[in-house]
């Protein structure tokens, strides 16, 4: 369609004269317009053909850009750079994230220790060089899948391994720190509380039993901890150093605010060694001059005393109090017995025992003769006065005499004797009719006018 320039009437393109005003249209202008429309149509067709190619080219450019972006963050070299940057910048949180595995969670404090250990035991420059070389070799190798970075002393400090691929094109490198188990071996049952893997942890170790406290990556550790025993609660640290271990475990050194007590006794020479006891905070224990007692918390007073027996009588020292301010890791204390009191008692008892032994020697000399006479004469009356009537021993000897089964005895020796009230226990060494030496224990009763009579006997 076209418009008449004179009256504005619409007309078809091929019309030469306006039907309304008779104006004659210019044929050249119509031809030009037709040619222009055909050119536009042709250009539109060309543009429509070029659009898919342009889109494809744009997508290709995007893919290339994306590839380089992915390579910058996911290639083995990029993965290495992330770890190196974290260690160089002491980024303990990033290192903890990179080294944590499903089985072993590494917290930021462990990572901090690990970073320092690398710098001290490998050297940052050497570590970076070793790591880059290791990653490069693994990336190029078709057979090797893992390798270790080591310290100057040859200990493994980082495991580098292939772990599948990232985005099809890039080898996925896995960085894992090897672990060891720190072990404790307390003298008594102990509960340890500390932080590990970002969480609070509690370990209970039995007395004199090796107990691991967890899995830790390489480092020199000084972990804040609390420990509890029957003696109290202690604040301090658990210390262990990977440099001091060539095995899968590493010994823990305990560093707590504790006191160990060494006890010296004076005035105890007359006491029976096996009877000596030490009582600390109401807890009684056997005494040994070579033993240290504890540990005990350094923030609480300690009460201590000692006891021992002489001739079955118990003697005790005064109770001493060691102030918390006087407690040290190794604390020595001396406890004094009243030696004069003990010696007087022992002397008195020894006189009594000698007197008793003399009586028993006389008694058993007569008893052995009477026993043998009863055997030879088959007459119980010879020995009856030495045995308490009504006792089981009385009836037993009487029966043996009648049956002729009474044993002959000779050469009685008093080995030991104790008196408790009117009862006396004596260990007597005899020679029987077969010529064999035997020890027998007799129980006697002391009656009126100090008369002794046997109640029972048994083999030692």
UniProtKB/Swiss-Prot annotation:
Predominant location: membrane
Region (Required for teicoplanin susceptibility): 49-177
GO molecular function: zinc ion binding
Any single GO CC term annotated in Swiss-Prot or TrEMBL for this entry: plasma membrane
Observed effect of gene inactivation: Increased resistance against glycopeptide antibiotics, especially teicoplanin.
Cytoplasmic side: 1-49
Zinc finger (C4-type): 4-21
Xref: Pfam families: TcaA_2nd, TcaA_3rd_4th, TcaA_5th
Keyword Coiled coil appears in the UniProt entry: no
Induction: Strongly up-regulated by teicoplanin and vancomycin even at lower concentrations (10 ug/ml). Induced by oxacillin at a very high concentration of over 1000 ug/ml.
Gene Ontology biological process terms from the UniProt entry: response to antibiotic
Residue ranges crossing the lipid bilayer per the database entry: 50-70
Localization, UniProt: Cell membrane
Source taxon at top rank: Bacteria
Presence of keyword Zinc: yes
Extracellular compartment spans: 71-460
Database matches in InterPro entries: Mem_prot_TcaA, TcaA_2nd, TcaA_4th
Topology class, membrane: Single-pass membrane protein
Keywords noted in UniProt: Antibiotic resistance, Cell membrane, Membrane, Metal-binding, Transmembrane, Transmembrane helix, Zinc, Zinc-finger
Function: Plays a major role in decreasing resistance to glycopeptide antibiotics. Overexpression confers oxacillin hypersusceptibility, without affecting the levels of resistance towards vancomycin. Could be involved in virulence. Overexpression increases the levels of teicoplanin susceptibility. Overexpression also increased susceptibility to oxacillin in methicillin-resistant strains.
Family named by the database record: Belongs to the TcaA family.
Protein name, entry field: Membrane-associated protein TcaA
The species this protein was found in: Staphylococcus aureus (strain COL)
């Amino acid at each position: 369609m076209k418009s008449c320039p004179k009256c504005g009437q619409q007309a078809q393109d091929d019309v030469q004269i306006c039907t309304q005003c008779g104006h004659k249209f210019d044929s050249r202008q119509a031809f030009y317009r037709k040619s222009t429309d055909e050119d536009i149509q042709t250009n539109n067709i060309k543009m429509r053909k070029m659009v898919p190619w342009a889109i494809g080219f744009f997508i290709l450019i995007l893919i290339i850009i994306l590839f380089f972006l992915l390579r910058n963050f996911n290639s083995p070299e990029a993965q290495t750079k992330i770890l190196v940057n974290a260690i160089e910048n002491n980024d303990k949180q990033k290192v903890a994230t990179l080294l944590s595995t499903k089985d072993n969670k590494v917290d930021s404090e462990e990572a901090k220790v690990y970073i320092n250990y690398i710098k001290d035991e490998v050297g940052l420059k050497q570590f970076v060089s070793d790591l880059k070389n290791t990653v490069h070799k693994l990336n190029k190798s078709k057979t090797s899948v893992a390798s270790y970075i080591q310290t100057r002393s040859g200990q493994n400090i980082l495991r580098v391994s292939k772990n599948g691929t990232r985005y099809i094109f890039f080898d996925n490198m896995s960085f894992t720190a090897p672990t060891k188990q720190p072990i404790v071996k307390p003298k008594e049952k102990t509960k340890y509380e500390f932080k590990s893997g970002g969480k609070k942890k509690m370990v209970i170790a039995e007395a004199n039993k090796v107990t691991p406290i967890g899995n830790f990556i390489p480092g020199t550790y000084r972990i804040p901890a609390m420990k509890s025993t029957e003696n109290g609660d202690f604040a301090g640290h658990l210390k262990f150093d990977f440099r001091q271990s060539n095995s899968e475990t590493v010994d823990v050194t305990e560093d707590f605010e504790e006191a160990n007590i060494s006890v010296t006794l004076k005035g105890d020479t007359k006491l029976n060694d096996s009877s000596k006891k030490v009582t600390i905070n109401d807890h009684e224990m056997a005494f040994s001059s070579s033993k240290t007692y504890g540990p005990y918390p350094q923030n609480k007073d300690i009460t201590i005393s000692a006891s021992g027996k002489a001739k079955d009588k118990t003697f005790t020292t005064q109770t001493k109090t060691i102030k918390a301010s006087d407690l040290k890791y190794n604390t020595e204390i001396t406890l004094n017995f009243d030696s004069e009191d003990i010696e007087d008692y022992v002397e008195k008892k020894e006189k009594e025992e000698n007197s008793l032994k003399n009586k028993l020697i006389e008694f058993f000399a007569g008893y052995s003769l009477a026993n043998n006479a009863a055997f030879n004469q088959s007459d119980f009356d010879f020995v009856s006065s030495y045995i308490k009537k009504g006792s089981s021993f009385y009836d037993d000897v009487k029966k043996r005499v009648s049956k002729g089964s009474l044993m002959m005895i000779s050469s009685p020796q008093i080995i030991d004797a104790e008196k408790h009230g009117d009862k006396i226990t004596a260990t007597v060494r005899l020679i029987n009719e077969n010529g064999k030496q035997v020890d027998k224990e007799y129980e006697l009763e002391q009656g009126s006018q100090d008369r002794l009579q046997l109640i029972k006997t048994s083999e030692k």
